Amino acid sequence: NMANSLGYSVFLSTFEKQKAYLQGVGKNHPLVFVSLHIAEEFSDTYTKDMHAMCAWLNEEGFRIVADVSTKSLELFQVSSVREIAKLLDVYALRLDYGFNHAEMLALAKEMPIVLNASTIRVDEVEDLVREGKEILAMHNYYPRSETGLDEEYFLRITKSLQDAGIHVIAFIPGDVLKRGPIFEGLPTLEHHRHISPYAAFMELTLKYHVDQVFVGDPGISTYEIERIQSYCDTGVIDIPATLKHAEHFYDKEVTCRIDSPSWIIRVEEARLLKKVDEHIVPNNTITREVGAITMDNDAYLRYAGEVQIVRSPLPADNRVNIIGHVSPKDLSIL
């Protein structure tokens, strides 16, 4: 299953800086996206540098998804993209403009191919899906603020592609070393632009059921990579929070009650964690904002010790103490 690991984007211009965190990440054979037609990267040593970069990535265990256009053919002085694929030892090709249907079909029989999710017409690629090895559709990333996709369009396109048997790929922003010249993140969805990579990954995976997630930016912190990998390995969701009034809850694994209403998450184990004769005095009984972590105090009688995480704003209640807060960049996980 592809969603078992995060994909990365590697750029020639930032490759030396990216090596540091990519070292050792390749052991699960994650996919890595490399574009072979970024005009500002072209130089006299372009093909040599690209060759060296791809060799390193393959050596480390990554599987390369190369974005090719007819421009790439000129650069590498070859007559077909198949030759580029062999030359750089790529796993899959993303075909943008400039390729006709017959070429695509021939390639699809040999290797996974990736098409542009926004321009693909499902009825035109039925034969590719039927006869090809694997057909994927990749949403774009959007460097300029306010140009990322809205939720409704994204969901509609994603679902129609998946219904046709096509795996869907989308991008999340990084949190360090963002891609220039705008430096505002490379998400597919606009509302992911300023949240944590982890929260964006979780939403794409759990809410939108995307098959594969790539980081669009060249940089993502080891902290975020580890959180994402940990979810992929264990299925446990990590919720960063500050717990000023309940330090003993840090690093505890808890279960969300399956019957939690949409406005709160009820923690299943909470009342069990309370000692029989423990008193919970009213404290910090203020308005419950989104992300507030609450504990019912003694005034709530047998509910004393009940712990909840707030998903929609609720009024203050003198029986409910606020014991902490989910970190702002991770609120969408809720």
Where are these regions (language model features)?
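Short, flexible, solvent-exposed loop/turn segments with mixed acidic/basic and small polar residues
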Residues: 1-2, 205
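Active-site beta->alpha loop and helix N-cap motifs at the rims of alpha/beta catalytic domains
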Residues: 3-130, 134
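Short secondary-structure transition/capping segments
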Residues: 9, 76-88, 107-120, 161-165, ...
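Residues in well-ordered beta-strands of folded domains
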Residues: 9, 138, 240, 308-310
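Short acidic, gly/pro-rich beta-turn/loop elements at beta-sheet edges
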Residues: 18, 76, 147, 225, ...
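Electropositive, surface-exposed helix/loop patches at the edges of structured domains
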Residues: 66-81, 97-105, 152-156, 206-215, ...
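Catalytic alpha/beta core domains of metabolic enzymes, predominantly
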Residues: 116-243
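C-terminal functional modules
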Residues: 242-334
